[in-house]
Design a protein with these regions (language model features):
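Tandem CBS (Cystathionine beta-synthase) repeat/Bateman regulatory domains
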Residues: 1-168
């Protein structure tokens, strides 16, 4: 993967000594993330997603454990197919009662970069959990791409400077 980006190999457990530091560099902590409790009402979830302008958010239980990911589509299909609800009636339905088509697979805080990138390729955000599966935050695909893009510019800049110096 990293060779495709022109950055050499990604750090490994052996080369860095602390893999957790690698992926946690990208972490948006739980206190800065919009998430939904599984016992919140469908209406509360819709309003939270609308307020934050998100199309998908992590779902956790009251003990802080990551349960899955809920999307706008999950909610709309639930309203149409499972509950046939008005918005007022949606106050009585919890997020846990909705079927989720797919969940964003989490990584553990001590996962390696390859695992993070593998998941980020197919998910807009990657939930991060601790060894007890407590939700601790997310890593966005945007942050990972931005980091590697900036690194690629750093690699290209010295090469450009060398080429300019050789011409003079």
């Amino acid at each position: 993967m990293s060779s495709l980006l022109g950055l050499g190999s990604l750090p490994s457990r052996e080369s860095t000594g602390s893999v957790a530091m690698n992926i946690l560099f990208f972490l948006t902590p739980k206190n800065e993330v919009a998430y939904i409790f599984e016992d919140e009402s469908l209406r509360q979830a819709l309003e939270k997603m609308e307020y934050h302008k998100y199309s998908a958010v992590p779902v956790i239980n009251r003990r802080g454990k990551y349960v899955g990911t809920i999307t706008e589509g999950d909610m709309l299909w639930g309203i149409k197919n499972k509950f046939n609800l008005s918005l007022k009636e949606a106050e009585q339905v919890t997020v846990a009662a909705l079927d989720r088509r797919s969940d964003n697979r989490p990584v553990y805080a001590d996962s390696n970069m390859e695992d993070l990138i593998d998941k980020a390729l197919n998910q807009n955000f990657v939930p991060v959990v601790d060894d007890q599966k407590n939700f601790i935050g997310i890593i966005t695909r945007k942050d990972v791409i931005r980091y590697f893009y900036n690194k690629s510019l750093e690699v290209q800049q010295p090469v450009a400077n060398c080429q300019t110096a050789a011409i003079q």
